[in-house]
Amino acid sequence: MANIKSAIKRARQNVKLRQHNASARSMYRTYIKNVLKAVESGDQEAARAAYTKAQPVIDKAANKGLIHKNKAARIKGRLVARLKAMAA
């Protein structure tokens, strides 16, 4: 356990931030899973709607530093590729 006052405060903050980050990470993963489920079911409209909802959540995770911006681009690109493959 930390002895210095500022280190004690940082330890307290880290607990809160870890919980917040875990929640946000879970949320963006859930949105991705919703898109993948819609693609698997074969419903194009539901898949497009799910992707439209997921896109800003993924971008927000990247902007907040939860994931790297390149990873966000890669995830969105893969989802779009699945949507296009489903349409073809």
Curated annotation (Swiss-Prot):
GO terms for molecular function: small ribosomal subunit rRNA binding; structural constituent of ribosome. Keywords: Ribonucleoprotein, Ribosomal protein, RNA-binding, rRNA-binding. InterPro entries: Ribosomal_bS20 (IPR002583), Ribosomal_bS20_sf (IPR036510). The keyword Ribosomal protein applies. SUPFAM superfamilies: Ribosomal protein S20. GO terms for biological process: translation. The keyword rRNA-binding applies. Signal peptide: none annotated. It holds the Pfam family Ribosomal_S20p. It comes from the Bacteria. Belongs to the bacterial ribosomal protein bS20 family. Binds directly to 16S ribosomal RNA. NCBIfam families: S20. This is Small ribosomal subunit protein bS20. It comes from Legionella pneumophila subsp. pneumophila (strain Philadelphia 1 / ATCC 33152 / DSM 7513).
